[in-house]
Amino acid sequence: MKKLKVGAVIYAPRVTVIWDLITKFYEENGAEIEAVFFKDYKLQVDALMNGEIDAAWNSPLAQLDAHLRSEGKEKIGCMRDTDRDRKTYLVVKKGKFENISDLKGKTIGFGAIDSPQARLIPINFLHNNGLEFGKDYTDKRFDIGVGLHGDHVGGEKDSMMAMVNGEVDATFCLDLNYDAWISDGTIDKNEVEVLAKTDYFDHCVFTFTPETSDEDIKAFDDIMFKMDYNNERDKEIMDLEGLKQWVPGRRDGFKQITAANEYLGNFIKEYNSEQ
């Protein structure tokens, strides 16, 4: 495997720690990578398209951005087990609403403007269930960490707390976040309920330039697949990155973000032009 430059967005301070550990892991397995850090996903995809990096650890929206900009020529690598088969939950106060249609004319909270799981996919989900964006409900956005595509969870959590406090009637959050907030007491399971769930979708994935050879991508993936959660050193990396196993990437899981982008009039192109 040739030396690969791999982009990563610093959505939290631990990102640099994670990639220091991953870089050492590759060295121990006879390969060399160089982590290149970015402050947001637009700059990361810019670098990928310009050939300044070979790969990017991308959000669903950033993967779609790369796919559209490369006219479908981008390649993909592995993802985390926790990236597969995610859902977003529509959450309300317990007993307040019975159906999605009951939210017509109400105020719905969303995460940051560019969050796939807490805004874009939810808006398309509401559209598919008869509620049109900009017409059938008032949207209240919690723009925390714009440019990070919702990875920081901030706006998503703020929207949830606004729902709990009665500032909005409903909110959306990733299934894993909902479970974590119920578990740690951030939200009271006796006060809230899941009104509806989206279909499954996939989250982050490694995106490669069209010029990166299939052999190098396979070598990159094969080394990542060697991480073993039962090994204490590997477990440290995997716990920080939120997984128990690296698995092959796949394209089918990005249909919902693609549909959301189209519903909002090529959101990512307009969004990038304003950054």
Ranges and model annotations:
Residues 48-49, 103, 163-164:
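Hydrophobic residues within well-ordered alpha-helices
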